[in-house]
């Protein structure tokens, strides 16, 4: 049982390492202005591309640090969601961005499976059952 859990955690680290590495490379290219100006102009963004690159770097770094991986997962999801919206608004394919978003969440589940427990439906508490007049089951 413990060996399976370790393999899942290693798999999550590998997945997040690959995604974060790709984001660090792409974010660095944006921060240092290595993108051609014509490509940046085609995006039609009001923010300078360096700001987006800095956000991408921040998301990737937070995703890799164990203590901040939950925040990194949330921010990275927002980043890829924004990339999907940008491509949808330009009527461009967004399959790769969607795949990266899915991979980020799979890696998050593999690294910390208990983190998704807050998404489950909980039964009514004892006080809520008393408030609506339901019989208490002990």
Protein language model features and the residues they cover:
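Membrane-interface extramembranous regions
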Residues: 1-138
